[in-house]
């Protein structure tokens, strides 16, 4: 089946069908092979991506800039000081103006509504580079990595341990759409958004996967194929950091926890990691850790997103 994503926004993976997500993953795999063998793939010659950063990021900025360079295009970095938003210009007007100059907009924002408003008023594709609700580009890289390492996604037990945050949301959504058995373990009061839980349950019913929410990390990771965690306090939650350290301490991914998983389990983390908090050195630096492959796959997954949304590749190859 030929799937066209040209002109689409990528705000949340719940907006995408399993077939569309697989199209992105297959395209990402193709680009990764092409890069490895030195095959040029300058499919976006003359195209420009505007990158709006309300929140700084190493991986997001570098991977999107390199992705556009490999595809023959150009990435333009815009932080809060570069935009007129702080002086009163609305997001709607910013979106309208940027649409006259560039071919796509990637935004890394605090509030999800900001990226939704950009998409509402922009006439070019808008990509969510991270919001407080979702992180779709990270989840695409995550499931690309699982597919590479496990040979499949369907039936793989993916366990997320920690805060029910934006990364958790996207991991839940994509995994249940692709038939994984997704388990989330959080402290009480730190569960994922109820709307996302409902989506995950609906997705799993349609895909043949499953979803389970627990508050016991040991029970959650039993026979896990993948153990995933993230920081306990996200950017903007610094005031809560000390309290969160106490609450999340029993949810640390360490050698005592991972011994309950399968012996060939994979450890994953979106990075940056706070070593000694959500994960210990002996786990993140172990042979079971795939965090560096996972980080690399951000590049390939985002190349696929850019090429597909900007019409640089035809699917069905």
UniProtKB/Swiss-Prot annotation:
Q: Which NCBIfam families match?
A: orni_carb_tr (TIGR00658), PRK00779.1 (NF001986)
Q: Where on this chain does carbamoyl phosphate bind?
A: 57-60, 84, 108, 135-138, 270-271, 298
Annotated positions binding L-ornithine? 166, 230, 234-235
Its EC number is: 2.1.3.3
Q: PROSITE patterns this protein is in?
A: CARBAMOYLTRANSFERASE
Report the protein's function. Answer: Reversibly catalyzes the transfer of the carbamoyl group from carbamoyl phosphate (CP) to the N(epsilon) atom of ornithine (ORN) to produce L-citrulline.
Spell out the PANTHER family in the cross-references: ORNITHINE CARBAMOYLTRANSFERASE, MITOCHONDRIAL, ORNITHINE TRANSCARBAMYLASE, MITOCHONDRIAL
Record's SUPFAM superfamilies?
A: Aspartate/ornithine carbamoyltransferase
Q: In which pathway does it act?
A: Amino-acid biosynthesis; L-arginine biosynthesis; L-arginine from L-ornithine and carbamoyl phosphate: step 1/3
Q: How does it assemble?
A: Homododecamer.
Q: What is this protein called?
A: Ornithine carbamoyltransferase
Q: Name one Pfam family in it.
A: OTCace
Q: What's this protein's family per the entry? A: Belongs to the aspartate/ornithine carbamoyltransferase superfamily. OTCase family.
What GO molecular functions are on record for this protein? amino acid binding; ornithine carbamoyltransferase activity
Q: Where in the cell is it found?
A: Cytoplasm
Q: What class of enzyme is it?
A: transferase
What Gene Ontology cellular component terms go with this record? cytoplasm
Keywords of the record: Amino-acid biosynthesis, Arginine biosynthesis, Cytoplasm, Transferase
InterPro entries found in the cross-reference section: Asp/Orn_carbamoyltranf_P-bd, Asp/Orn_carbamoylTrfase, Asp/Orn_carbamoylTrfase_sf, Asp_carbamoyltransf_Asp/Orn-bd, Orn/put_carbamltrans, OTCase_ArgI
- Write out the catalysed reaction: carbamoyl phosphate + L-ornithine = L-citrulline + phosphate + H(+)
One GO term (biological process): L-arginine biosynthetic process
